[in-house]
């Protein structure tokens, strides 16, 4: 049973680690989404400025190309990250299932040990009762 307790403890630790990893990945995905939103906002703001000024319009094309390339890179990174998050969630779910099976097995072993202990105690009490009954019966005959 000690090895099962150790397995449960190990799997709980693995679940904690997987949960932390998933939280880190989610936080990174949120940062990527925010950066993409910021780029879109900057592009819109610069487009408005480019419409107002000839000098700004000349540099807007280069700015737009750089920011658009940066946005595409972030979007690709976000797509890759979303796949990694999906894998991490699957691994976490599998770890939970495995932990649950170990916990169920441990619980069954504990219940079995408790039943066996109860049987041993009952056998001792039965033996004591028989001894007392014999002594009482023998005393009554004497």
Show the residue positions of the predicted features.
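Charge-rich amphipathic alpha-helical interaction elements
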Residues: 1-142
